[in-house]
Amino acid sequence: MDNNEKEKSKSELLVVTGLSGAGKSLVIQCLEDMGYFCVDNLPPVLLPKFVELMEQGNPSLRKVAIAIDLRGKELFNSLVAVVDKVKSEIDVIIDVMFLEASTEKLISRYKETRRAHPLMEQGKRSLINAINDEREHLSQIRSIANFVIDTTKLSPKELKERIRRYYEDEEFETFTINVTSFGFKHGIQMDADLVFDVRFLPNPYYVVDLRPLTGLDKDVYNYVMKWKETEIFFEKLTDLLDFMIPGYKKEGKSQLVIAIGCTGGQHRSVALAERLGNYLNEVFEYNVYVHHRDAHIESGEKK
């Protein structure tokens, strides 16, 4: 195993810290969506024990992000020493990300959320004094950070995009597309981002031999696909999705749910969901899953 392969096999730990109100919670949420195992507000003294667990090779702990802030002020003072100890003694890749913002911006954010700064709770002081005290206390950990991000002029979306550029693992694609078929008469797919109604297509229900089957059966699938209307629809649908899906991912979504509905969710929607799932698997390097919610609900009513 060469040096590059050894580095790739190591577990990775990202310590996220910085000024209160600078965006740590948003960063942790983003990292979690990217496949990181996330821990919020771990006391620094427990960091070496936690890293020892990572060294044991648990797959779920291959990429870990830990948020540490100044709420435990006395414990926080040991963070720099603990990080140095971990780097020198334990075979884990460790980075420190420090988030900060201007005092004016932090004051504005606290006014918007109406939350108290953690250092205001430890004594009767103004918000601006609490922010200045925190900035001073965190200066040492800031000095050893691998990444310092000033979020003053970053929107939540822009901050997420920056985090993804820094830390997204190209070998671990977390964006997932779920394609599901459903029947309108059983209720719409509530978690869908996109819903397409295919009740305008010729219905296999009216072919006696096809009625008890589903779109998973070859005869039903071929029946649905043989119509010119189906081909035109599928071409327009895939053209639309080819345009939209990269935009959804760029926007920061970790999952896209595409629902295709017919009357009962047994024939047309099932066949088209299968075809769409196969198409998306071929075109995109994302995780694509196909699910048929109502395909096997037995009913004597029109499907």
Swiss-Prot record:
Displays ATPase and GTPase activities. It comes from the Bacteria. ATP binds at G18, L19, S20, G21, A22, G23, K24, S25. Gene3D superfamilies: P-loop containing nucleotide triphosphate hydrolases (3.40.50.300). NCBIfam families: PRK05416.1 (NF003828). Pfam families: PapZ_C, RapZ-like_N. Keywords: ATP-binding, GTP-binding, Nucleotide-binding. HAMAP family: RapZ_like. GO terms for molecular function: ATP binding; GTP binding. This is Nucleotide-binding protein SAB0719.
